[in-house]
Amino acid sequence: MLRLGLCAAALLCVCRPGAVRADCWLIEGDKGYVWLAICSQNQPPYETIPQHINSTVHDLRLNENKLKAVLYSSLNRFGNLTDLNLTKNEISYIEDGAFLGQSSLQVLQLGYNKLSNLTEGMLRGMSRLQFLFVQHNLIEVVTPTAFSECPSLISIDLSSNRLSRLDGATFASLASLMVCELAGNPFNCECDLFGFLAWLVVFNNVTKNYDRLQCESPREFAGYPLLVPRPYHSLNAITVLQAKCRNGSLPARPVSHPTPYSTDAQREPDENSGFNPDEILSVEPPASSTTDASAGPAIKLHHVTFTSATLVVIIPHPYSKMYILVQYNNSYFSDVMTLKNKKEIVTLDKLRAHTEYTFCVTSLRNSRRFNHTCLTFTTRDPVPGDLAPSTSTTTHYIMTILGCLFGMVIVLGAVYYCLRKRRMQEEKQKSVNVKKTILEMRYGADVDAGSIVHAAQKLGEPPVLPVSRMASIPSMIGEKLPTAKGLEAGLDTPKVATKGNYIEVRTGAGGDGLARPEDDLPDLENGQGSAAEISTIAKEVDKVNQIINNCIDALKLDSASFLGGGSSSGDPELAFECQSLPAAAAASSATGPGALERPSFLSPPYKESSHHPLQRQLSADAAVTRKTCSVSSSGSIKSAKVFSLDVPDHPAATGLAKGDSKYIEKGSPLNSPLDRLPLVPAGSGGGSGGGGGIHHLEVKPAYHCSEHRHSFPALYYEEGADSLSQRVSFLKPLTRSKRDSTYSQLSPRHYYSGYSSSPEYSSESTHKIWERFRPYKKHHREEVYMAAGHALRKKVQFAKDEDLHDILDYWKGVSAQQKL
């Protein structure tokens, strides 16, 4: 119960009308300024102007409250007011000087109140007031000097009041006045009103609502309009009063009178003020008039069409004031041009057909506009004979732009055509050079250039020059090794290594060669000449690799037979082909542990001739891994014996073919009598290393564990897993397709760059900008083939001695990797 009582008491306190504190909606700006304070329709309504509003407010709206009076004490603190809305209150009294503190006030709305008069004191201090709205009040008297303190008034709304008479001097001091609304007042059309009517005739009222000004008294003039658009109409008050009050003399009516217009910003009045905002902005000059040229400016219509007009403006003194030609369009106006000469011919174009236009000559002085004379005309309707306005300028611009674009397209097309033609010529020349070089590599350097070019032009014909292969040497199977005397005799005869390049080796000078297949040359017809070249070289290298492997295994087998005596029993069905080893093999002699280790067959000693040495892996011609270089795991340490085989160079005794001497380099085991191949016997079974056991001699890969110019993967053979039959099967030639012959080291699908087998030739692909954006080639794979072919061709073509064998050694490793 106690809680319910407390809640009820609190609710009564909140809902009590007397305790409610009125508030206003404020729109604030920077630095604490209040731009707008809306205190209208407050509940409860204000009876006095509230004092809690910030004094910096610019726009104060107190309409629809219950204000009774306007006092100086309640307004003096609002010094920044520019707009004050007191519409629909109960104001009946305004203190004299109540607006003295509002020197910046421009709009004052006092409509729908209970004011009975307007005096000079009530409007004192508002020198910047432009709009005064006192409509729908009870005003009966407006003193003649009521607006003397407001010289900037533009619009006055006194409609719907109780005015019966006005003095002629009431609005005479308002030079900027443009709108004076007096409709809805009960005018008494007597002679005391004639002075005001005389001013009203001269005044150029923008609204032109003359029909709304009517007389209510005396009775005989009730309903007569004060003024009408035709002033000499018989039924109007001014005509009657002119005959009655001036003895028949009509007051002089000037044809034109300067009507000032202020450029100050017009403010939209409140919607409840009883004043239509469109009527304020309705600026329509009077009808056209003619004046004396010596008295003031004059404007005449010279020529008019349905889209243009020509005006003649005459100004007697053009430099006395600043004259401007202004166009009025209902409620809007715009400046056309400044008039600086006494007589100017103004041509107006881009007009609409059958449209009324109004142009006025206006002078500007002290930021105020004065209309001197105006001209209104209507453009005529277009006829079939009239021509539309010319659009030559626009057409000229459009055609110029299109011409420039078309010219740019032509120039770019010509440049593109020239560059493409030049590029095609370069490609053609490069293709011819490649074919020429390939023919040189096939037929040798001693062939004359004319024959090569002639052969290159015949793309589909087979070669007519004989091409010899490398001489084949009979197999070593079944033959015995030469005696020790033969070996010693061979040591006494040194061999001089013959020098030759790859072309000479391929042609096989002095040897029995096989004819080259005739279907090799037509491979040049396709677009991948370099790929065919690499494939051809790879095939030849495979054959060389097979020969080298056969020779190495034959040497190991014969050495094992020599050391094992008659107890060494090999498989008689095994056949080895060695086309590069002599027919009579040399015998070996046992040497000490200090024997000089030399490289294996076709493995030259490494020279630091390259600035960028590559890490050499284990050689493919080594028969065992690094672990088998010492002692086999199948034998014991005690029975392990180290043998060395001396291979002397004795070409006369062995009967080497003349053509095979090109394969022997001066660094090979056949050249030096002191070269020894260390052989490691591996025990078998229980490790009894007697003479009756089978000894497998293995070449120690001492040299191949060092660095070399070329890096290639090695062959690994596990001694325990690989049998002799497996090794023999490895020596069988492998058949691979032409596509697989291009090794991964040179495959353009993995490396889009050139290839060079040594650092002497750069491996970077020098693509030009045009090559990257060639529209007629979607892929640069052919360029990669060309780069690889050129690099390898140069290296092989100009290689001598050790360099040649280095290349063969490299390709041997590559071939071995592919076989794995």
Swiss-Prot record:
Q: Where is the signal peptide?
A: 1-22
For this protein, the record's InterPro entries field holds:
ELFN_Fn3, Leu-rich_rpt, Leu-rich_rpt_typical-subtyp, LRR_dom_sf, LRR_TM_domain-containing
UniProt-listed GO biological process terms: chemical synaptic transmission; establishment of protein localization; gene expression; synaptic membrane adhesion
**LRR repeats span which residues?**
56-77, 80-101, 104-125, 128-149, 152-173
Sugar attachment sites: N54, N80, N85, N117, N205, N247
Identify its membrane topology class. Answer: Single-pass membrane protein
Q: Does the keyword Transmembrane helix apply?
A: yes
Q: Where is this region: Disordered?
A: 250-294, 508-527, 589-612, 654-677
A Pfam family that this protein carries is LRR_8
Annotated GO molecular function terms are:
protein phosphatase inhibitor activity
Q: Cytoplasmic face: residue ranges?
A: 419-820
Database matches in SMART domains:
LRR_TYP
* SUPFAM superfamilies in the cross-refs: L domain-like (SSF52058)
- What is this protein called in UniProt? Protein phosphatase 1 regulatory subunit 29
Q: What's the source species for this entry?
A: Homo sapiens (Human)
